Swiss-Prot record:
Gene Ontology terms: biological process: translation
HAMAP family tied to this protein: Ribosomal_uS13
GO CC aspect terms: cytosol; small ribosomal subunit
Keywords noted in UniProt: Ribonucleoprotein, Ribosomal protein, RNA-binding, rRNA-binding, tRNA-binding
PROSITE patterns: RIBOSOMAL_S13_1, RIBOSOMAL_S13_2
Example of a GO MF term: structural constituent of ribosome
Lineage start: Bacteria, Bacillati, Mycoplasmatota, Mycoplasmoidales, Mycoplasmoidaceae
Function, in words: Located at the top of the head of the 30S subunit, it contacts several helices of the 16S rRNA. In the 70S ribosome it contacts the 23S rRNA (bridge B1a) and protein L5 of the 50S subunit (bridge B1b), connecting the 2 subunits; these bridges are implicated in subunit movement. Contacts the tRNAs in the A and P-sites.
Protein name per its UniProtKB record: Small ribosomal subunit protein uS13
A Pfam family the protein falls into: Ribosomal_S13
SUPFAM superfamilies in the cross-refs: S13-like H2TH domain (SSF46946)
Assembly notes: Part of the 30S ribosomal subunit. Forms a loose heterodimer with protein S19. Forms two bridges to the 50S subunit in the 70S ribosome.
Organism encoding this protein: Mycoplasma genitalium (strain ATCC 33530 / DSM 19775 / NCTC 10195 / G37)
Length: 124
């Protein structure tokens, strides 16, 4: 496995796809990096030379990835909750943030159902 920016990427995959294993680099970012490094995106990771790996590292060094990106996202969410914005309140309550409905659905964000028992009707 080749190491790029401290992350092991799979050898058997095309370099274009293998770069997406790095948190913060998607397919479009991977294509941009490979274009900067002047490397064929169809090339397999195992076929890359050391010079090509160095070129990829240099091209990708400007991107915020892995720990730095996760930290920035967490700080952004923390800031939203501290200032009491709508999005911050939704984050705090573990509800959908982007305006989705919650009466039905939203199970991923809310977690498993909490069943509420019905009151028994007393007969006279």
């Amino acid at each position: 496995m080749a190491r790029i920016l401290g992350i092991d990427i799979p050898n058997q995959k095309r370099i274009e796809i293998a770069l997406t294993y790095i948190f913060g680099i998607g397919l479009s970012s991977a294509k941009t990096i490979l274009k900067k490094a002047k490397i064929n995106p169809d090339k397999r990771v195992k076929d890359l030379s050391e010079e090509e790996l160095v070129a990829i590292r240099n091209a990708a060094s400007g991107y915020k990835i892995e720990g730095d990106l996760r930290r920035e996202i967490a700080l952004n969410i923390k800031h939203l909750t501290e200032i009491g914005s709508w999005k911050g309140i939704r984050h705090r309550k573990n509800l959908p943030v982007r305006g989705q409905r919650t009466r039905t659905n939203a199970r991923t964000r809310k977690g498993p159902r909490k069943t509420v028992a019905n009151k028994k009707i007393e007969s006279k």
